[in-house]
Each structure stands twice: as C-alpha cells, then as structure tokens.
UniProtKB/Swiss-Prot annotation:
Cofactor mode of binding and number, as noted: Binds 1 Mn(2+) ion per subunit.
Co-factor(s): Mn(2+)
Species this protein is from: Koribacter versatilis (strain Ellin345)
Protein's recorded name: L-arabinose isomerase
GO BP field: L-arabinose catabolic process to xylulose 5-phosphate
UniProt GO molecular function: L-arabinose isomerase activity; manganese ion binding
Gene for this chain: araA
Gene Ontology CC annotations of this record: cytosol
Amino acid sequence: MIDLKKFEVWFVTGSQHLYGPETLEKVAEHSREIAGGLDATPQMPVRVVFKPVLTTADAVHELCREANNAAHCIGLVTWMHTFSPAKMWIAGLKALQKPFLHLHTQYNRELPWATIDMDFMNLNQAAHGDREFGFIGSRMRLDRKVVVGFWQDLEVISELGTWARAAAGWHDAQHLKVARFGDNMRNVAVTEGDKVQAKIQLAYSVDGFGVGDLVARIHAASDRDVDHLVSEYEDTYTLSEPLTAKGKQRASLLDAARIELGLRHFLKDGNFHAFTDTFEDLHGLNQLPGIAVQRLMADGYGFGAEGDWKTAALVRTMKVMAAGLDAGTSFMEDYTYHLENGGLVLGAHMLEICPSIASGKPSCEIHPLSIGGKGDPVRLVFDSQTGPAVVATIVDVGERFRMVINKVNVIPPEVPLPKLPVARAVWIPEPNLAVAAACWIYAGGAHHTGFSLCLTAQHLQDYAEMAGIECVLIDNDTTVHACKNELRWNDAYYRLTGWR
C-alpha cells in the first residue's frame, strides 16, 4: 500500500532581522500555527512541518540543501510574512532540487479597521513581501506553484493538497524503476520513446528483461502459495463456473495465480513499481497475464500494455498521487465509439483494467483471446464506477515529452454488455467527442492512457510543471482552433528555450 503520510512538505517563512526579535517571534508563532493548521486538515495528504523563520542568505541556502538531502521531504511551501529581500534567496533557490509552492496568504483574514497601526502594518507585509519573492522566482525562470487566499479557506487548502499529491508523485518518480518483459508491440510507434531522456527529464529508469526471467519466477511458485492465492480469489470475486473447484478450466485459474506470484516476486525483489508486457512475447507462459496485472495495479503498481513504458510509469505516478482517495485509477485504452447523440467512448483493454475502478464485485472469468497464441486468459470483468474523471497520456514528440489530458464524465453503459468479456468504462469526453478526439489526435496523444476517477486535471498539470514537460488540457473550454494554435505556440516556445 502507498502511505503518503510518510512524506513531508516543509513550511518555510521568510523575513529579515530589520524588524527586531519581538516581530520575528510573532512571525514564527504565526507560521507555526499555519503549518499546524494545514497539517491537521484532511485535504492535506502529507505532513506539513514548520521550519524556523529564515532571515539570512546562509540560512536559506542551508535549508534548501537540507531539503534536497531529506529523504522524506518532497517539497517546500514558502511564505513571506514580512518583507524578505529576495536577493538572499537566490543561492538557495538555485540549489533547491525539489518542488516549491508559493503560498500568498496572511495570518489574519480581515483588517482590524478601527485599531490598525504601523505595528500591524510592519508585521503583516505579505501583500508586498510575496511580490518581492515572486519577482525572484520569475527572474530566475523557476517553475513553481502560486496559491493565493486565506490559509484556512477550503479552496486554498484543497489547492495545497492537490500540489502535495503531485509532489508525492514526482518524488516517487525519482526512484521509480519500470520492468519491461519483452519489447514493444512490433511496428507500433507511440509506445516508443527515448529512455535516456526519460531518465534525465522524468527521473525514472526502464529496464528490459527476457520473458524467460519471469517464467523462472513463475515456475518457482509453490503449490501451497498457489492454493492460498486461489482461495483469496474465491473469497474476493465471483468465479465463473469453468473456474470453480470442479470446473473444466480450473487449471487455468491455478496458472493465473502462479503467474501473479511470479510477477509479484520479480517486481518486489527488483524494487520495480511499474511494468509492461506484450502479447507478442509470451514464450514459456501458458496465458497472457490478466488477473495478475489487474491485482498488481490495485496494489499500486503501474502497468502499460504492449511494452508501453511511458504509460506504465504514468499509471504508477497517478496511483501515488491518488493514494487514500475514494474511487480508483487504472491503465486504459480508448477502444471503440458510440457515435449517436454526441458520441461516447468505450474504454477497455484485452484484459488489464484495474479493479480499483469497479462499480461492484468483479466477476472472475475465462474467455478465449484471439491474439497471442496462448491459452484462454483469466481476467476480472466489471463495469466502472461513474462520475467525473480524467484520461491522460505522455508521448515523446521528438524534442520533448508532452502530456495530454482530457476531462471526461463516466456514465453507465446504455444497456448491459453480457457478451463483452473485459472490464470497461463508458465516458463522455469534454467538450464533446468530436472536439476532444480531434484535439487529442492533433496533439499526438496515445491510445493508452492513465484513467482516474479521483484525480483531477490540476493534479496532472501540477505534476507536468514539476517535471518541466509540455501539458495540453482538453476540457469544456477547448476548441479545435485554439488547441491547434496552442500546439503551434508550444512548439515555438520549446524550440526557443531548448530541450529541457
């Protein structure tokens, strides 16, 4: 399980010695109260830790270096309670290697109109102190998040929580290892990409393995462990008749359990948290992994089909960002359309949709698979939960990585789907199918996505800014004309600024 409470964001307040010890004591007192208040809110997924008020360039530099080396620190929240000359922040911000959020707030919500004096004015200077700090961030061309409002307002707290989830995803990516069993599906373009640049830009590493390495782990699984896992299947899911104890295809369920055990051991021993496979490279396997992949995703692993390592890493990052939230997150594919009444997307895949998005108890079934040349694979079948969701992809467009996001609304299937033997989700894309699909195609978005009913576009946008990658959002405000222009402008911007 993914526990975000092991992570910290440090609450860092800037000031200067000009104001004297009494004022600085009040600055520290207020800052400690704000940090504690944010830490106690349910919207904050990580710990908020107060740090001593910074009043010198050396103190700023030391704290930023300390943050870089602190394993559990995922970023800073900065606030200038008083005026803090920004030149003293330059060395520290140049050294800082973790994301930071600039909280533009003040301790008091209202002005004490009848009693306000210069003591109050000299203490509560964020209105201009934060502008000074904002200038140096812009002057240094630093990517950061700016949140404005009173620190106790729900909207402000929610923005901070969203950013913290993105920071947790970015922090996880710094150590993320993706295992690829086999290569890409042959001749497919969008699943390719520059793994060296991914390591430089997105931090994670991608390692390839022959399927035989996995097969050896699968064969090593004990019969006792297989029986125990099958018993868990029986307790958790509704087994179709062929997979029951006396069913004709019970052996396939045992094979599926053995595959899951082998995969788990391989990933755990290698400290991998995302993986890919491909139906074109199954030598030594009796079936394409189905239920094994689904259950691993439910436990927080990222997955990409047909060798799609970028989507595998993205799904893992989205899993981390979504930890502790209701609803689920999954690998997904835009599979087919319903083109009446504005259009619907039926999202699915051959097997590998995460049961965290299931609307009810999944059914464990076995059906033929016409590709791969192996036995019938076992999979979980269900309809998705409904409600607002996002689909997102990261593609390599040659000189940079691009994230494409589409806001969608998941609805129940218009009629039951008794003959469709895979998990599925039906959604209406924003603003509609025609515009969303056209813009997605113009942007070069992949057919594989990360799908989430609990994350928002803002989570993903915050992550993209931390990673320094292009981000294209398709929502109710999008038009094809504006999207094409945005893509042109982005292309010019990234060419002028260089491949980061």
